[in-house]
């Protein structure tokens, strides 16, 4: 017996024209092109699927887009030039890599407040959080390092030299490994 096909909605950040094209993957057609802030970069979906979070890098903000209406419904603060981010496993916190000031900004989504700014290496980019939410990792492109951060204290616990220009970080589902 054949398994049923799955249809999803895909969201893209289009840096060149400051838009977020939304695609129905069943038809592979653009449903809507949402006008967003300047130089959109990182993008993620809330765990309940109700919101898309998008880095508007040149506006120094995170835009919150309602997935039902495809409208921008809110903005969250960020440091200069937010590039990429990761959502905590409980969906309450965003960890944002801010390229221009070499910081990871910790944002409480509900209160829309910056909880902490954590100094990291030059050109922070990749972001990952462990499945248990206790450890966050940021990669710095220019310094070729991975910075391990305790999410309770917002302190860097370790800096590890990795290969040249790491741009991505992701933990395995069991949390035993992190890939750069």
Task: Give the location of each predicted region.
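Predominantly soluble domains enriched in secretory-pathway, periplasmic, or organellar proteins
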Residues: 1-180
